[in-house]
């Protein structure tokens, strides 16, 4: 049964402000309609930028004309905000206004709400139209990730290389202060204090902090989010869920979560975390460490050590040295960088686009991006302009700013996330080449950094990314409650904490946990 459009818009509006009226989505396949227009089909695309530090896809990108000639598509591409939370806000606002783009990417939580409200096209029949992409990316796990009631409402594609982040520290600051790499939470507190109060950069000013972060959450890394996971891991409460058979449940219900809260409050009260951490966006956070604002943080391999990303830090601090370290060990001997999941991005086709007969055109475009000409153009740019081929036929970035690793060339591969499957040696070696820094003359390799990060201690949590999500009201209560404890608005005592957790469970937390248990058991996710 097809939902009334006004009802869908109302449901999406409620979703954007925090209340969702879940409904049965349309079961009509997106592939059942065909485009009747004789002229070019206008397709709007919202994409996550491959590199947020450089500009959007340029207007003179060669792909626009190629796509028009090959598929009769007039593509209008617009970048999404760099942070996942800001992306969610933009997408939900568009849904509330019944103005979703034809194709866009969404996190699973937002995707699920849009799908349940009938705002997304049923794409089940479109896999057959994309044989190459389906073989490369859409295994049964990927299809299951976007399945509702036996139908698929999106394409789950690899979003990033797995375990590509780590806890990092300014080794030059450690050396200047005569400190060792911290091994335990006690060690870390001492190092963070010294980084804040002992002038590690030697400029005679009190302008540094020990730890840096920003709020980056998703359905498997609940508030305070990814940048604090190495600290949560020291207490065994990394990730939203504990996925073990013996101790399954929401981490917030574990006694150790309170221990983490006490530790985090100690860091905050001692003034050793950048006080802007709750306000920073991703770009603010990355700009801050490049300016030497803090000396310990969790970061992604490419954002840390790829040539264009590392260059500002190298220029500011030629003698600076940021190294990957083991996650610190907590009082009970636990340690983890965070939960390791199968990183997936859901590409969606809006229901309206399908009604207008655009779905098959979009599928053809998506398939073109997965191999041959489209893959090379989206992933590496133009041969002889952004890349050349080596003796083995592998792409290499052209030297200088215009190569695909340079600040100009990177703008031409902003759709790389639509092409890459993040598994082949060619992708990894070409994406993360070795180089020599321009100012300090150091040898650098973000691929070596990746392997270093992958070798650290992670918590295997495959499947956590597909677990049920809470209602918007419950999620808001959860996040605001923790923020109030961190800020001091609510005093962090055992009694106050227990009262908060009890209220959380009464509001729906316990029901959410039981829903998660049933899902995990049914899908064999418990270990």
Residue ranges of model-derived segments:
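Extracytoplasmic/periplasmic substrate-binding proteins
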Residues: 49-62, 175-181, 215-273, 303-341
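Helix-loop-helix "hinge/cap" segment bordering the ligand-binding cleft or interdomain interface
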Residues: 147-223, 241-288, 297-300, 348-361, ...
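Conserved N-terminal structural module of periplasmic/extracytoplasmic solute-binding proteins
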Residues: 3-12, 20-187, 227, 232, ...
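Secondary-structure transition/capping motifs at alpha-helix termini
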Residues: 1, 68-73, 97-98, 180, ...
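General small-molecule cofactor/ligand-binding pocket signal
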Residues: 74-80, 275-276, 323-325
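Structured mid-domain segments that build the active-site/substrate or prosthetic-cofactor binding neighborhood
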Residues: 293-348, 355-407
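Conserved small-residue motifs centered on glycine
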Residues: 364-489
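Secondary-structure capping and boundary motifs in well-ordered enzyme cores
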Residues: 59, 256, 289, 341, ...
């Amino acid at each position: 049964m097809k939902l009334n459009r006004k009802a869908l818009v109302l449901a999406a509006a409620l979703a954007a402000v925090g209340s969702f009226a879940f409904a049965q989505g349309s079961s009509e396949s997106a592939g059942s309609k065909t485009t009747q227009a004789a002229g070019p089909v206008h397709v709007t695309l919202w994409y996550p930028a491959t590199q947020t530090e450089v500009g959007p896809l340029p207007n003179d990108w060669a792909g626009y004309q190629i796509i028009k000639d090959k598929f009769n598509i007039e593509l209008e591409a617009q970048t999404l905000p760099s942070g996942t939370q800001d992306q969610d806000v933009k997408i939900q606002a568009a849904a509330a206004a019944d103005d979703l783009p034809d194709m866009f990417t969404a996190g699973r939580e937002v995707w699920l709400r849009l799908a349940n409200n009938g705002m997304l096209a049923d794409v089940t029949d479109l896999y057959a139209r994309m044989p190459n992409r389906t073989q490369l990316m859409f295994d049964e796990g990927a299809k299951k990730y976007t399945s509702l009631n036996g139908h698929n409402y999106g394409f789950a594609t690899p979003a990033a290389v797995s375990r590509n982040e780590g806890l990092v520290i300014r080794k030059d600051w450690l050396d200047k202060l005569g400190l060792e790499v911290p091994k335990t939470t006690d060690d870390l507190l001492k190092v963070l204090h010294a980084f804040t109060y002992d002038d590690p950069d030697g400029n005679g000013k009190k302008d540094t902090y020990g730890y840096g972060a920003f709020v980056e959450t998703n359905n498997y890394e609940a508030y305070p989010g990814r940048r604090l996971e190495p600290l949560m891991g020291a207490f065994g409460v990394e990730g939203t869920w504990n996925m073990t058979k013996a101790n399954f449940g929401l981490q917030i219900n574990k006694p150790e979560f309170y221990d983490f809260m006490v530790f985090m409050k100690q860091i905050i009260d001692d003034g050793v975390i950048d006080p802007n951490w709750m306000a920073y966006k991703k770009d603010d956070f990355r700009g801050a460490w490049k300016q030497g604002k803090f000396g310990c943080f969790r970061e992604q391999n490419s954002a840390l050590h790829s040539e264009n990303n590392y260059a500002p830090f190298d220029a500011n601090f030629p003698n600076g040295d940021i190294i990957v370290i083991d996650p610190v060990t907590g009082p009970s001997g636990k340690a983890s960088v965070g939960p390791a999941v199968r990183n997936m991005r859901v590409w969606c086709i809006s229901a309206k686009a399908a009604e207008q007969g655009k779905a098959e055109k979009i599928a053809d475009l998506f398939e073109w991006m997965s191999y041959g000409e489209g893959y090379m153009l989206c992933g590496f740019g133009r041969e002889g302009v952004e890349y050349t081929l080596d003796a083995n036929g592998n792409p290499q970035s052209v030297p200088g700013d215009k190569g695909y690793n340079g600040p100009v060339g990177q703008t031409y591969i902003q759709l790389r996330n639509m092409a890459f499957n993040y598994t082949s040696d060619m992708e990894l070696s070409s994406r993360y080449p070795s180089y020599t820094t321009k100012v300090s003359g150091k040898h650098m390799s973000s691929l070596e950094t990746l392997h270093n990060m992958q070798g650290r201690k992670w918590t295997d949590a495959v499947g956590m990314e597909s677990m049920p999500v809470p209602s918007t009201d419950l999620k808001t209560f959860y996040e605001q409650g923790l923020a109030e404890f961190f800020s001091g608005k609510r005093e962090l005592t055992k009694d106050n904490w227990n009262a908060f957790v009890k209220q959380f469970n009464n509001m729906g937390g316990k029901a959410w946990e039981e829903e998660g248990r049933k899902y995990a058991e049914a899908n064999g996710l418990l270990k």
